[in-house]
């Protein structure tokens, strides 16, 4: 449920707080029924929706806006399909209107994606910067999807983006955290939440990203395309929680040599003269 007061260890983005640190998508599910159940099982409170696909009635997206309970979920419209900054800005406005129609009149959020080609689906840094600057001036809360590039991330948070969302590996690839070192650098320096987006395949990878200090994750394909999406949704939700708790708990340092877990003094046979 969308929070009006911050719960302990809430995910805080702009002026909103959430209990769950797992964001989910709505694409690639075999049915709306499975999607609803998987989102519920995950515990996710932020759900991203591809504005262009809903608007154009792409199979699996037509009527999507009415399939989820937006009184309990926060919509994150995304600009998937935008090949330029100009298209992204246009889709962002469509998304804001869609959120208003569905009852979220104060929702000015947008997951910004500018992807000019369809083979590799890698975000365009220049187009992203240009669109982000425009959208921030127009009053949007911008969550940009980017390559794991520290300098780009810094430009975006200095510009006023509410988060940065570096990719773990290409969208839908299931390659996991190929950019872990670069993401760790962004996490170490970012004053805004870092949301790892794209490429995560398994709950163990989700847990690892959270252990690194990510503020949240966005996972779609790994849940939607799993053999059992509902079970995978729950698994990803639990992994996100476990990774967050492990990060807060503080793992022991790696050591070169063994260190006994029980004291070696006072053992039988250790007395003088033995």
Swiss-Prot record:
Substrates-to-products reaction catalysed: [ThiS sulfur-carrier protein]-C-terminal-Gly-aminoethanethioate + 2-iminoacetate + 1-deoxy-D-xylulose 5-phosphate = [ThiS sulfur-carrier protein]-C-terminal Gly-Gly + 2-[(2R,5Z)-2-carboxy-4-methylthiazol-5(2H)-ylidene]ethyl phosphate + 2 H2O + H(+)
Annotated keywords: Cytoplasm, Schiff base, Thiamine biosynthesis, Transferase
EC code(s) of this entry: 2.8.1.10
Name of a matching Pfam family: ThiG
Binding-site residues, 1-deoxy-D-xylulose 5-phosphate: 172, 198-199, 220-221
Active site as annotated: 111
SUPFAM superfamilies linked to this entry: ThiG-like
Record InterPro entries: Aldolase_TIM, Thiazole_synthase_ThiG, ThiG
GO CC term (a single one): cytoplasm
Compartment list: Cytoplasm
GO biological process assignments: thiamine biosynthetic process; thiamine diphosphate biosynthetic process
Molecular-function GO terms, alphabetical: thiazole synthase activity
Pathway as given in its UniProt record: Cofactor biosynthesis; thiamine diphosphate biosynthesis
Enzyme class at the top of the EC tree: transferase
PANTHER family assigned to the protein according to its UniProt record, in alphabetical order: THIAZOLE SYNTHASE (PTHR34266:SF2)
Function: Catalyzes the rearrangement of 1-deoxy-D-xylulose 5-phosphate (DXP) to produce the thiazole phosphate moiety of thiamine. Sulfur is provided by the thiocarboxylate moiety of the carrier protein ThiS. In vitro, sulfur can be provided by H(2)S.
Similarity-based family: Belongs to the ThiG family.
Protein name: Thiazole synthase
The species this protein was found in: Gloeobacter violaceus (strain ATCC 29082 / PCC 7421)
Gene behind this protein: thiG
């Amino acid at each position: 449920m969308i929070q009006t007061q911050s719960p302990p260890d809430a995910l805080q983005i702009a002026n909103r707080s959430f209990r769950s640190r797992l964001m989910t998508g709505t694409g690639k599910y075999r049915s709306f029924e499975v999607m609803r159940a998987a989102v519920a099982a995950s515990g996710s409170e932020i759900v991203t929706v591809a504005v262009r696909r809903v608007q154009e009635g792409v199979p699996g997206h037509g009527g999507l806006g009415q399939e989820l309970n937006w009184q309990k979920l926060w919509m994150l419209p995304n600009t998937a399909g935008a090949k330029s900054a100009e298209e992204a800005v246009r889709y962002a406005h469509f998304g804001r209107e869609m959120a208003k129609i569905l009852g979220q009149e104060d929702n000015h959020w947008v997951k910004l994606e500018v992807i000019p080609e369809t083979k590799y689906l890698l975000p365009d840094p220049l187009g992203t910067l240009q669109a982000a600057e425009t959208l921030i001036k127009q009053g949007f809360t911008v969550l940009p999807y980017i390559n794991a590039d520290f300098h780009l991330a810094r430009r975006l948070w200095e510009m006023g983006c509410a988060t940065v969302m570096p990719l773990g590996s290409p969208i839908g690839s299931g390659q996991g955290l190929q950019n872990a070192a670069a993401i760790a650098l962004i996490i170490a320096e970012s004053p805004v939440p870092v949301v790892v987006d794209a490429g995560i395949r398994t709950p163990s990878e989700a847990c690892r990203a959270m252990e690194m200090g990510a503020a949240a994750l966005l996972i779609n394909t790994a849940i939607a395309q799993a053999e059992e999406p509902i079970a995978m949704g729950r698994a990803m939700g639990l992994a996100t929680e476990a990774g967050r708790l492990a990060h807060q708990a503080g793992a022991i340092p790696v050591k070169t040599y063994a260190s006994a877990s029980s004291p070696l003094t006072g053992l039988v046979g250790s007395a003088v003269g033995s």
